[in-house]
Amino acid sequence: MLDAFAKVVSQADARGEYLSGSQIDALSALVADGNKRMDVVNRITGNSSTIVANAARSLFAEQPQLIAPGGNAYTSRRMAACLRDMEIILRYVTYAIFAGDASVLDDRCLNGLKETYLALGTPGSSVAVGVQKMKDAALAIAGDTNGITRGDCASLMAEVASYFDKAASAVA
């Protein structure tokens, strides 16, 4: 896993070049937006149980066959595994938000996840719907302007959305 700083330095080093002005400007902007980034991570983390529970509740209301006898989330053990997986995906999304880089999400969460779900007979499309529901909830919570660092958060919210989209497409 490389954070945004290590990634830029590593790429410049591999090319045998100094950091460019545009790279330094991009990293400076990342530092300037650091408080907003921490606010977003804190909000999502502080509401993680609610985000996961509500996303699961909504998913099962839309796809009741998942919790019916024979469904992939039928029995308390399978339901717990489903909620655990949603929680893990959300946790790694917050790591990516904090780092400003999706590599931690890719390397430690998404790599091989689709194949695991296929092997278990878990419908990846249902997992993707659950991730999208977490995305909607997380964006609503993170985008609330009350009590957070002031400033334009449009690009940060787009970045947050992209991590959820990456997770959803990885399992679909």
From Swiss-Prot:
SUPFAM superfamilies: Globin-like. (2R,3E)-phycocyanobilin 2 binds at C153. The keyword Thylakoid applies. It is found in: Cellular thylakoid membrane. GO terms for biological process: photosynthesis. The keyword Ribonucleoprotein does not apply. CDD domains: PC_PEC_beta. The modification N4-methylasparagine is found at N72. Its main location: membrane. Induction: Phycocyanin-1 is expressed at similar levels in green and red light (constitutive phycocyanin). Constitutively transcribed in vegetative cells, not expressed during hormogonia differentiation in red light. Contains two covalently linked bilin chromophores. (2R,3E)-phycocyanobilin 1 binds at C82. It is a peripheral membrane protein. Heterodimer of an alpha and a beta subunit, which further assembles into trimers and the trimers into hexamers. Belongs to the phycobiliprotein family. This is C-phycocyanin-1 beta subunit. The lineage of its organism: Bacteria, Bacillati, Cyanobacteriota, Cyanophyceae, Nostocales.
